Amino acid sequence: MQDKIVIHGARAHNLKNIDVEIPRDKLVVVTGLSGSGKSSLAFDTLYAEGQRRYVESLSAYARQFLGNMEKPDVDAIDGLSPAISIDQKTTSKNPRSTVGTTTEINDYLRLLYARVGTPYCINGHGAINASSVEQIVDKVLELPERQRLQILAPVIRKKKGQHKSVIEKVQKDGYVRVRVDGEVYDVTEVPELSKSKQHNIDVVVDRIVIKEGIRSRLFDSIEAALRIAEGYVIIDTMDDSELLFSEHYACPVCGFTVPELEPRLFSFNAPFGSCSECDGLGIKLEVDTDLVVPDASKTLREGALAPWNPISSNYYPNMLEQAMKVFGVAMDKPFEDLSEEDKNLILYGSDGKEFHFHYENEFGGVRDIDIPFEGVINNIKRRYHETNSDYTRTQMRLYMNELTCGTCQGYRLNDQALSVRVGGQQGPHIGEISDLSIADHLDLVSQLTLSENEAIIARPILKEIKDRLTFLNNVGLNYLTLSRSAGTLSGGESQRIRLATQIGSNLSGVLYILDEPSIGLHQRDNDRLIASLKKMRDLGNTLIVVEHDEDTMREADYLIDVGPGAGVFGGEIVAAGTPKQVARNSKSITGQYLSGKRVIPVPEERRVGNGRFIEVIGARENNLQNVTARFPLGKFIAVTGVSGSGKSTLINSILKKAIAQKLNRNSDKPGKFKTITGIEHVDRLIDIDQSPIGRTPRSNPATYTGVFDDIRDLFAQTNEAKIRGYKKGRFSFNVKGGRCEACSGDGIIKIEMHFLPDVYVACEVCHGTRYNSETLEVHYKEKNISQVLDMTVNDAVEFFQHIPKIQRKLQTIKDVGLGYVTLGQPATTLSGGEAQRMKLASELHKRSTGKSFYILDEPTTGLHTEDIARLLKVLARFVDDGNTVLVIEHNLDVIKTADHIIDLGPEGGVGGGTIIVTGTPEEVAANEASYTGHYLKGKLHHE
């Protein structure tokens, strides 16, 4: 087998016909500036070809189900293995997908509970065991010799009625005696039963004495009793004690039944086991009392009930006042001071009690009727479900939230599944074990109390569960729970989960391609991740990791630096070799940072801010432990802490949503907290994330930043356009008029090839320009609109230097380091880091009030150290204008430049959720309890 992968003539995206050799069975890191061509080499060339070759080996019939793989633009690749890509984009947003289902641990847990679980009655009647006739007979024969007993068949358990037909059937079947409510009667002398009382009726099948040779008769009698009572039998020992047996998993006392234990019973994705109320989602759309009564200090007359306050008619306020008068509830008392009984009446109605309602509308219509008071919550529910009006449904939805399902308490499963426990009655059910953190889950699984027989059955299942939990633990995910929805995971978390799954598969000879697995990982956990990557390598796999993390680069066997710049200025191999060899390469920007020749400097002084702050008091969402956090305004703030310490909960779930609720009247409810102060000091909240700036190729930097509007205005003002009567819309490729209709302004045409990949060719009519020939005859400075869209931002800044409105917007794109991007480049081809900087550029050219609050969650994702240096300069401009910038970040180069740090921890999950230290980087570095401080110390002193 070849000892290296050899690529000849790679030209995907901006790659410049490069040749590169990659050693096999090594940990190879591909690095370079954002947009330099790293992903084009790793994913769009290597992975695409590896996957395509595998699919090509399948039959034409199988290929039609897998979709067609496009051949990457490369001359040849030798020594390629089957490729598996682990990137950040494939997280399932399906609410049924959880950490447990993604890692397949749920499958093993379901098997464990089906094989060694014991059901317990949900009404507290103890263990429910299913017994065969043979087992029941053996149990009865353990009773002392000469013991007298009755064998009873319980046909009625706690049911109201006279049950005459039951007694008649017993008599017809030839039985002589029945026991009714504890008294034995001749079947012909049973007294008339009360219709309104609950009764128990047992058929006396046999009366016997335990002695030698009785087994055969006992067997027949028990079998008959089980048949009559549909699987139940009572052994009455005639001395006030009874033995209850069942052929099924059913409680003999209350009749609670559990079907046969099999894995599907424990799946919330199958109707057999899922909660019928929420269909296995664990959450339901319910009316949220906090949204119905947003300000409990108001009285009913002042409008405490939001849905019935600002309304087009007075119908509901009238109804409320008349009902409250009848039911004796004060209209002028603050809602919070009303009794629980009164609050329940207002929210949930009068439980059938009626009042007289008189109402006259503005058109003279009169309503005079005796009706029960419905209650505001029931009213919202009814109108939401019954209305045909989209407007009404939207209005009612404002007062609803996804709340934990009250039937299954969020466990997603039905009572039958949740009645089964492992490790005795005090052991966990499958919902409880899934709610434990990975670390606690590991401890519990190692300490389960099982019988000798159960231990033998469970051993192989527990091994698989432990192995997978250990892998998750080793990649820094010890704080996650198996019940956590996959859609709530960050890109880094979901990637490390799939990484753990791959480690568990123990494959060898595979080419793994990873995209920044260190995202969202604290420096403390980085070593464990690198150890996991090395373990995969040692199994005989080749790992190609697109990464900017300095520690990962230094630990790599081989380092490839793509560059030297980004976009058209990149696409070449600048350096390749061991990390030490790359560090000595003077042409490599990466090498200069590795050798210490280039550094991001520590600011000489920290900003003091404007003296104001926003304060969140008593935050208690997820793992936050009644945290109070103060965010000083006019500063660059970094929120830090190990993975799972509560950073995202504090910022994204509470601070961001609380500010948005106040400033933007956003209905998205923040997490639990007591109060928040200081929002009046900011006038705008801007969340700048790495999501795409557009979902279709029609969206591009020019349209996103708004500069295309100005450019179209400029073209419409040229003499040629005026003579022809062309308006601004003529120069849009999205509407009829100026665009090429053959390709609808796309510039390309898709040709379906069925069993071969779809082919995209330039439109034959417009030759890829997007516009018709008449539109292209209009020029500004000898360039038509299509040629302008093909310009890089750098070229366009010069081209439009005498048009300040356009030049200013383009300059901001250049300032954030995106000068290499073309104005018409499809938004779908921009990386996450590029999209984020495009959003920053769009913000930069807006007039600043100095009271904006910017939030960025891990802005360094996908950014090289050189890109980070540029990003920090842009963020500094926002702060220098008086605004506040807050970043959630693990990157020490960013943290060391902050004015103020809020460090959460000390651990992730239940071990986190408190603020360890706040202050300047120097103050945090001096704190012994802070993991961030420990690593920061080296950075500050090193500089």
From Swiss-Prot:
Which HAMAP family does the record match to this protein?
UvrA
PANTHER family recorded for this chain? UVRABC SYSTEM PROTEIN A
A GO BP annotation: SOS response
> Which named protein is this?
UvrABC system protein A
Where in the cell does this protein reside?
Cytoplasm
The record describes the protein's role as: The UvrABC repair system catalyzes the recognition and processing of DNA lesions. UvrA is an ATPase and a DNA-binding protein. A damage recognition complex composed of 2 UvrA and 2 UvrB subunits scans DNA for abnormalities. When the presence of a lesion has been verified by UvrB, the UvrA molecules dissociate.
ABC transporter domain mapped to chain residues: 308-589, 609-937
* UniProt cross-references to InterPro entries, sorted A to Z: AAA+_ATPase (IPR003593), ABC_transporter-like_ATP-bd (IPR003439), ABC_transporter-like_CS (IPR017871), ATP_grasp_subdomain_1 (IPR013815), P-loop_NTPase (IPR027417), UvrA (IPR004602), UvrA_DNA-bd (IPR041552), UvrA_inter (IPR041102)
- Tell me how this protein assembles: Forms a heterotetramer with UvrB during the search for lesions.
Q: Which residues form a coiled coil?
A: none
The entry marks the following residues as binding ATP, namely 32-39, 641-648
Which Pfam family, any one, appears in the UniProt record?
UvrA_DNA-bind
Task: Give the principal location in a single coarse category.
Answer: cytoplasm
> What are the boundaries of the C4-type zinc fingers?
251-278, 740-766
Where is it found, in Gene Ontology cellular component terms? cytoplasm; excinuclease repair complex
The family this protein is said to belong to: Belongs to the ABC transporter superfamily. UvrA family.
Record keywords, A-Z: ATP-binding, Cytoplasm, DNA damage, DNA excision, DNA repair, DNA-binding, Excision nuclease, Metal-binding, Nucleotide-binding, Repeat, SOS response, Zinc, Zinc-finger
Molecular function (GO) terms for this protein are:
ATP binding; ATP hydrolysis activity; DNA binding; excinuclease ABC activity; zinc ion binding
